[in-house]
Amino acid sequence: ASLRRSLPRALNIMREAVIAEVSTQLSEVVGVIERHLEPTLLAVHLYGSAVDGGLKPHSDIDLLVTVTVRLDETTRRALINDLLETSASPGESEILRAVEVTIVVHDDIIPWRYPAKRELQFGEWQRNDILAGIFEPATIDIDLAILLTKAREHSVALVGPAAEELFDPVPEQDLFEALNETLTLWNSPPDWAGDERNVVLTLSRIWYSAVTGRIAPKDVAADWAMERLPAQYQPVILEARQAYLGQEEDRLASRADQLEEFVHYVKGEITKVVGK
């Protein structure tokens, strides 16, 4: 019983330590969000590695922002340009991590319906487009089913109410539909070229979620998948996991055939669970 009591406390201490590690950057990002969105801002939730499993060398700072009304074009551009100053690609800065900000309008997701609409997303992968004056519009985003499930399971409210109070639970069939839809992104080697590690780890997470109905950190899902993989695919996931944790160099691109077989095997296992 004492272990049951002390474990959540230990996890909270760890989580607070991780948040403290990025507190300066976090307060800058939240400051930018508040400055541009203040009158319409309902909530800001920190989710992902920072609060579940700990930040790894290349982990993003993930924020989910909820507002009451759509953003006008002037606000959208000004906000994105200012967020650019608070973020850096992995390995580019000694003090800044990559920031990913997803903005949703309250009435687009509450009550919940699938697929839901995303008002804005900012991430380092958009940097060149943003600098060229290209800004992504609001769009339907199947990933919101996964993102909101993550936020309800593990997040910290930096502004506004707790995620589990604010958001409806995402029905399991919608989560499965989103997971299944994500699988269609990866069919042949060009689909994962340059992003091998992330695709291997994301497939592990999707497999874990399909079987358990829950969402796990990448390294935890990789360990889980490792126990279920045939021996010939284990080196792929082991290398992805070690590279993610910063323990080894990422050489997955040199395992082309093995990698392709791994992707098709895991997709097959996931499809057995979620259909299609």
Model-inferred region functions:
Residues 1-13:
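N-terminal amphipathic/basic-hydrophobic helices that include classical n-h-c signal peptides
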Residues 44-85, 89, 98-106:
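Catalytic metal-binding acidic patch
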Residues 214-276:
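Structured mid-to-C-terminal alpha-helical surface segments
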Residues 14-16, 65, 245-251:
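Glycine- and acidic
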Residues 14, 18, 81-193, 200, ...:
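Conserved NTP/Mg2+-binding pocket subregion across the NTase superfamily
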Residues 11-45, 74-77, 275-276:
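Helical scaffold of the NTase/Pol beta-like nucleotidyltransferase catalytic core
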